[in-house]
């Protein structure tokens, strides 16, 4: 394989090094596409909802060092004026000339969420889908909101989905919706489910709820695979049902990579101990994991490396309409790549063909 500039320019067994070219011999190792986290609130002490643009640029290097070369900056439910400022800060980070993971857009998780499944979102700022407010936020972001999370049972939700389907990705999220309502949302244009099994009704054989959409080939589903949010046996069951449409996500907060302590998420206090992050009342509050670690978990749960790796790079790229840029190793794509051992030990990360400093 040859990299020219920041893209893969040639592939083939017949290639040989030209004079002056640097050569990387990866004998005995695997070369993987860089991983893509479509749902992450932050890590390394900074949060996409709270931190200034400079801090957001800083943590992109932290993502890259753990194998995440692409991400969607994921927001929380905040006060309206603060939400506008939040979008502007993320826009600033996207426009900065920094090193590290690429921000491909914003995953707007809130405020259009159900109060009965609010999780760690502040109920004081939840609201019904509002096209005018959304347009304001999208303008503040520079048009960079790529994924919008919402509860399809809220007044105006179906109209919102029909209005923005095709322009934005719409995800069913934080909802008590039954299967029939979820199916209507997909018919209207939603094609994504936020952290499957979490912040939704549990699966029942007569009332499958949103979980029942997992084998609908129209729908991409996020899955937090830290071993805490979803039991390993359920991860195996879900991969057996529809591995080609699953996206491993971290749903990480600023505490990821930082250790035990008390942190803030969307203005709420989060307590971290070991691998568990929770509000004071015990409600799970995001994770302290990363997609590379979770991909390793999935393999240890008994899923084939091929399916686990695809769920960390190719599937999310397809889900976000970015498969012509990232998610695979083929001619013309960005040279965002990981060098790993066969037992998934991360040895080197490349972004745009340039080695990331460890």
Feature map (PLM): residue ranges:
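Histidine-rich, glycine-flanked metal-binding segment
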Residues: 1-32
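Divalent metal-dependent hydrolysis catalytic cores, especially in the metallo-beta-lactamase
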Residues: 41, 57-86, 101-114, 141-153, ...
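Alpha-helical scaffold segments that flank or form the walls of functional sites
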Residues: 30, 38, 48-102, 125-140, ...
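Active-site core of metal-dependent hydrolases
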Residues: 138-258
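Active-site gating loops and adjacent loop-to-helix segments of metal-dependent hydrolytic enzymes
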Residues: 62-72, 114-142, 184-196, 207-220, ...
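Conserved, mostly hydrophobic/aromatic
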Residues: 28, 39, 63, 108, ...
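Active-site loop-to-helix "anion-binding N-cap" substructures in soluble metabolic enzymes
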Residues: 35, 42-51, 72-82, 199-215
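His/Asp/Glu-enriched, well-ordered alpha-helical/loop segment
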Residues: 212-221, 239-250, 255-340
């Amino acid at each position: 394989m040859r990299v020219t500039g920041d893209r893969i320019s040639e592939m083939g067994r017949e290639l040989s090094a030209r004079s002056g070219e640097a050569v990387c011999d990866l004998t005995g190792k695997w070369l993987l596409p860089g991983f893509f986290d479509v749902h992450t609130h932050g890590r390394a002490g900074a949060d996409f909802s709270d931190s200034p643009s400079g801090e957001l640029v800083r943590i992109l290097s932290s993502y890259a060092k753990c194998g995440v070369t692409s991400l969607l900056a994921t927001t929380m439910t905040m006060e309206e004026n603060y939400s506008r400022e939040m979008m502007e800060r993320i826009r600033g980070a996207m426009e900065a000339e920094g090193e590290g993971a690429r921000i491909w857009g914003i995953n707007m998780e809130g405020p259009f969420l159900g109060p009965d499944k609010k999780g760690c979102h502040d109920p004081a700022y939840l609201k019904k889908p509002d096209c005018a407010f959304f347009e304001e936020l999208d303008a503040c972001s520079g048009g960079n909101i790529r994924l919008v999370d919402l509860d399809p049972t809220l007044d105006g939700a179906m109209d919102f989905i029909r209005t923005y389907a095709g322009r934005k990705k719409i995800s069913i999220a934080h909802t008590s919706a039954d299967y029939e309502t979820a199916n209507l949302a997909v018919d209207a244009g939603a094609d994504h489910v936020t952290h499957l099994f979490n912040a939704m009704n549990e699966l029942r054989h007569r009332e499958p709820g949103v979980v029942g959409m997992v084998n609908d080939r129209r729908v991409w589903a996020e899955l937090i695979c830290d071993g805490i949010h979803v039991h390993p046996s359920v991860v195996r069951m879900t991969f057996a049902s529809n591995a080609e449409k699953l996206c491993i996500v971290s749903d990480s907060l600023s505490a990821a990579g930082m250790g035990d302590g008390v942190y803030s998420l969307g203005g709420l206090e989060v307590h971290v101990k070991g691998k568990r992050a929770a509000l004071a009342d015990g409600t799970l509050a995001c994770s302290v994991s990363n997609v590379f670690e979770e991909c390793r978990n999935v393999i240890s749960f008994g899923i084939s490396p091929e399916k686990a790796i695809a769920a960390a790079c190719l599937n999310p790229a397809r889900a976000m309409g970015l498969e012509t840029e990232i998610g695979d190793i083929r001619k013309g794509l960005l040279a965002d790549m990981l060098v790993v051992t066969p037992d998934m030990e991360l040895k080197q990360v490349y972004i745009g063909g340039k080695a990331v400093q460890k």
